[in-house]
């Protein structure tokens, strides 16, 4: 632990990692209000799940989720949003444990075969994670890796009955 003196003249204790971050990237440590004495920071990038933009009239794309109970939910979304962001933004049961970094398989979806070929080929990282997914099918993909586009307007994806978080070795 190191002691530092803030701009306001307060003494604070910070870890060696925080001190290194402060020296190399001072913009990472920012004051959130003028009254707080803490300098919050995070070593992971901020993700904006749940903050979806409303599509402009005429630019809406549609996606239908087939839920675990068989019911269907259709949403109008913007181009460029990932299926993971859309699901989480509408409080659907999709964990996304890794935050969309393609490091787990908890956003596994089963794509309707009519739309599967319109998707870009999965990258090696996605294929590696899909190999660990519970209930893998020929049209399985990771929701964090599929961005909405006009090519897949109207896509239908099913949420599998279970997902497996390989990082925690548990089931949800």
Swiss-Prot record:
Residues 1-16 form a transit peptide. InterPro entries: 2Fe-2S_ferredoxin-like_sf, 2Fe-2S_ferredoxin-type, Adrenodoxin-like, Adrenodoxin_Fe-S_BS, Beta-grasp_dom_sf. Gene3D superfamilies: 3.10.20.30. Keywords: 2Fe-2S, Electron transport, Iron, Iron-sulfur, Metal-binding, Mitochondrion, Transit peptide, Transport. It holds the Pfam family Fer2. CDD domains: fer2 (cd00207). SUPFAM superfamilies: 2Fe-2S ferredoxin-like (SSF54292). GO terms for cellular component: iron-sulfur cluster assembly complex; mitochondrial matrix; mitochondrion. Belongs to the adrenodoxin/putidaredoxin family. This is Adrenodoxin homolog, mitochondrial.
